[in-house]
């Protein structure tokens, strides 16, 4: 059995993440929080849909589904039933650069959840039957969320091909259903072997636990798992676009045109402060009815019925490594107003670059984002996942806890610099417009 190594940092204070690593490479972060008699357990794997090679698109998301279909000592569907029987909740989520699984249960159910997570990290059960079932489930998700809705997946599905060029950055997380249907259990087993090693994961525990006893329990359940090769960390950076480009899609049944622009952001890890400033800039520029773009584009000039701006392709910053994009999206009453909306967005960026933000508006925007982060951290499951993401991507789980304070320290100069960088980007985006109707009454 593997014993936990000495913690990388002391955790004498309640609520301070304690970090350790098992001999098999599993990174562990334990955070005591005794506000409620509950505990959250999350496992974050260093694989997302950007890691999928061509011909295997959608594997990361499909595998997330398969991880709930049973493991070496847990029958099909039993993982969910055991968590729910303890009074808990669970879920899994697939992102561009990681996949996360989490449970929130009463504190006395901690051992049960650690056993469940260790068992599926050891050996998930993948059969022809479970694979066929989950491919059908994914197909229904695609129909419900993408193909069966006029604005399905907008803009995270349609925008990347206009902004990026590589397969890793342009394909969406659902992938090509033809790739999934052509796969077999051996293909998914190979995916597990490549990416689901203990050394490619972070286990986070947040809640009413004693950190020392929790560390011993983790070592008991996860320590026997053998170390396996860990893939080199993938890098998905690509050159900046050198020309403007707006892709146009004619969509049947679309009520109104929709525009999305994607502007390359600073590296979220390598240039943390630049990315942070762009996040606050998004709140100033186009987040809510008091934002600059809503005031000018929606209320005053009536160029759009809705406008939003913010860091992160999916609308949620801090979830990825480089590259990421700043997204400006709008619903316009007519196709010809979309270009005017783009002009107005760049004019607003140029004004912020030249004059900087109104100090009071900056204070409000930063405070709103900080409050959102505090509310996220106040939920055990969300904090456990945040610790997993930040430990995985930044090597510092506690950075998630410090993020609200870092947001509040954003200066007018940093906002102006962020606006200058974005205003200098080429216009890359996508326009959805109602498909022409043909024919009429006979």
Locate the predicted segments by residue.
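Buried hydrophobic packing residues in well-ordered domains
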Residues: 25, 43, 61, 101, ...
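C-terminal regions of mature proteins
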Residues: 2-10, 202-204, 352, 360-442
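N- or domain-start disorder-to-order transition segments that initiate the globular core
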Residues: 2-37
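An aromatic/glycine/proline-enriched structural segment found at the starts
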Residues: 2-5, 165, 173, 197-198, ...
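M16/MPP (pitrilysin/insulinase) zinc-metallopeptidase core fold and M16-derived inactive scaffolds
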Residues: 35, 40-104, 170-173, 288-306
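Acidic/histidine-enriched segments that form metal/cofactor-coordinating
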Residues: 2-7, 45, 72, 79-191, ...
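Short acidic/His-enriched helical or mixed secondary-structure segments at domain edges of catalytic enzymes
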Residues: 139-158, 237-256, 299-308, 355-401, ...
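A structural supersecondary motif
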Residues: 260-264, 286-332
């Amino acid at each position: 059995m593997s014993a936990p190594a000495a913690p990388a940092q002391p955790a004498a204070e309640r609520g301070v993440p304690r970090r350790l690593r098992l001999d098999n490479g599993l990174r562990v972060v334990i955070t005591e929080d005794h506000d409620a008699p509950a505990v959250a357990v999350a496992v974050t794997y260093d694989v997302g849909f950007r890691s999928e090679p061509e011909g295997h698109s959608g594997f990361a998301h499909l595998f997330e589904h398969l991880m709930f279909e049973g493991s070496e000592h847990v029958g099909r569907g039993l993982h969910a039933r055991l968590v729910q029987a303890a009074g808990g909740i669970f879920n899994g989520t697939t992102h561009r650069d990681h996949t996360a699984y989490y449970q929130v249960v009463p504190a006395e159910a901690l051992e049960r959840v650690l056993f469940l997570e260790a068992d599926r990290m050891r050996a998930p059960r993948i059969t022809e039957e479970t694979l066929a079932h989950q491919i059908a489930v994914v197909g229904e998700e695609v129909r419900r969320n993408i193909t069966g809705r006029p604005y399905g997946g907008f803009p995270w599905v349609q925008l990347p091909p206009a902004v990026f060029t590589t397969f890793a950055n342009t394909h969406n997380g659902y992938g090509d259903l033809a790739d999934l249907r052509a796969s077999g259990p051996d293909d998914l087993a190979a995916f597990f072997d490549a990416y689901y090693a203990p050394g490619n994961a972070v286990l986070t525990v947040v809640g009413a636990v004693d950190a020392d006893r929790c560390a011993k329990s983790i070592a008991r359940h996860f320590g026997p798992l053998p170390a396996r090769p860990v893939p080199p960390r993938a890098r998905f950076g690509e050159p900046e676009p050198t020309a403007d480009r707006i892709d146009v899609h004619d969509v049947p049944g679309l009520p109104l045109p929709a525009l999305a622009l994607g502007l390359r952001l600073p590296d979220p890890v390598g240039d943390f402060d630049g990315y942070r400033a762009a996040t606050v800039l998004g709140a100033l520029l186009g987040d809510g009815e008091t934002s600059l773009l809503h005031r000018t584009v929606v209320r005053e000039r009536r160029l759009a019925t809705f406008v939003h701006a913010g860091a992160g392709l999916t609308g949620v910053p801090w979830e990825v490594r480089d590259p990421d994009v700043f997204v400006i999206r709008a619903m316009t009453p007519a196709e010809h107003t979309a270009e005017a909306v783009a002009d107005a967005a760049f004019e607003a960026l140029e004004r912020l670059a030249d004059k900087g933000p109104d100090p009071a508006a900056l204070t409000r925007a930063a405070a709103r984002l900080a409050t959102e982060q505090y509310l996220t951290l106040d939920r055990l499951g969300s904090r456990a996942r945040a610790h997993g993401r930040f430990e995985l991507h930044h090597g510092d789980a506690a950075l998630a806890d410090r993020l609200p304070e870092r947001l509040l320290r954003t200066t007018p100069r940093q906002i102006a610099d962020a606006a200058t960088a974005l205003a200098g980007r080429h216009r890359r985006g996508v326009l959805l417009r109602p498909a022409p109707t043909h024919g009429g009454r006979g």
